Each structure stands twice: as structure tokens, then as C-alpha cells.
Amino acid sequence: STICLWNCDQARKPTEAPKEEINELPHLAYSTLKGEPSTTRSLPGGSILILFNTDCDHCQREAQEIAEKSEAFKNYEILFIAADSVHHIENFAKAYDLANKPNVKFGRAEYQDVYKNFGSISTPAIYIYNRERKFVRSFLGETPVEELIKYL
């Protein structure tokens, strides 16, 4: 049987109040694109975590907008995580001109690890954390970049 954990969703669903379990950087294990193990807990303060699928139209548009407005995100580390193959993730990073941005990283996580930390989510799922590594706001689904910038 197949269980769908992530899906593309047009509707933007912001959550204003942080859930108690997402009040700081989660402990999501992932691998860098070079195969090195890491965890989202190692992210610095001032981070944006983006869970995405490489073939999701909404994720592609979100990445394009972030690349176009990358100057607004220069003081934040952005980590894109997908459960797709490393090859597909690398191609996504290159296609949207994010591969060589110093503050943008890409990683690969297992579906079950994402589900354990975030539950069933729509992609792109964007989580903003402040300098103290505390949760600020999440956005589920494609979101105008101007909305994200308001919370940086």
C-alpha cells in the first residue's frame, strides 16, 4: 500500500501561533547532497526550512521567487529538504539558480522522518526560525515571497 505524505497544494495556509512541538528547530535527520549526515538542529539561528518536492509546480515557483529576491534572505540560512533522489535535488538547485548561493543549502530526508517531525504536510512547507532558533511562522503551500519577507 502507498501512503502519500507530501502533496502539492495551491492554497496558502499560514499558521500564526506556533504549535508547542514546533517552537524550536526540529530534530529532522537529513543528508547533505554529498551524503554527509546532518540534522536541522545544527542550523544556525535565523534559518528558513523549506520542505519540497522537486516535481511540485508550486515548489518550483517558490524557489524561483526566492532566487529572484535572494538579497532579502541574505541574513538567513535557507535549507531546502526533499525526499527525492540526490540527482533530482541537484538539478532543482541548479535550475532555479540556488546551487551557488552561499546561504542556501539542499538536503535529502526520508519521508518517515519528515512525517515524524511535521506530520502530513502540503509542499512547499516553509518554517521560519529567528536568531534565537525559535519558531516564528510556517506557510503550507505556495506563498508570495513578500509574505515570507515580512517575518524575517
Model regions and ranges:
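Short active-site neighborhood of thiol/selenol oxidoreductases, capturing the structured segment around
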Residues: 39-60, 66
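Structural microenvironment flanking redox-active thiols in thiol-disulfide oxidoreductases
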Residues: 60-97, 111-116
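Thiol-/selenol-based redox modules, centered on thioredoxin-like
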Residues: 128-152
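C-terminal motif of bacterial Sec signal peptides marking the signal peptidase cleavage site
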Residues: 4-7
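N-terminal "domain-start" segment that seeds a small globular fold
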Residues: 9-40
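A short helix-to-beta-strand connector/capping loop
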Residues: 23-26, 74-76, 100-104
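Short, internal strand/loop/helix patches
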Residues: 96-127, 131
